[in-house]
Amino acid sequence: MSVILSACGKKEAKIEYGKVDCDFCKMKLMDNKFGVLMISDKGRNFHFDDINCFKRFQEENNISSKEIHISCTDKPGELVPIETAYFIHSDNIKTPMASGIAAYSSEEIANKTAKELQSNILKWVDIK
């Protein structure tokens, strides 16, 4: 008799840059400083290459999310819950789909960058 054990731990949220396409604009996600991962209530992963694609997808589709994670400019490729990120909007920020919005995991770095760009820090509730 053999026994099979499986781990029941939560999988780490991650985006496979260069391998997945944006579920809104259909372009391949390439820049690991930007990207959104939405996990639906049914467990399906939706990928977006820019926060604007994510916002427009939400406006056009009635899909409930269980989790939403965003890649941070100060830690490329690392995803954080979108509610904990700090955002800066500036025409000087070059993003995949020209939203000009970048997420940061650190309030200190976001403050420094906002000052350099003469911008303000926003939270997710301010831009969603």
Where are these regions (language model features)?
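C-terminal motif of bacterial Sec signal peptides marking the signal peptidase cleavage site
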Residues: 4-7
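Bacterial signal peptide processing site
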Residues: 9-11
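Short metal-coordination and nucleic-acid-contact micro-motifs, chiefly zinc-binding Cys/His arrays
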Residues: 18
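Post-signal-peptide N-terminal segment of Sec-exported extracytoplasmic proteins
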Residues: 23-63
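Short aromatic-glycine-(Arg/Gly/Cys) micro-motifs in beta-strand/loop hairpins
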Residues: 31-42, 80-97
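Charge-dense polyanion-binding interfaces
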Residues: 64-87, 92, 123-128
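C-terminal partner/receptor-binding element of secreted or periplasmic proteins
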Residues: 103-128
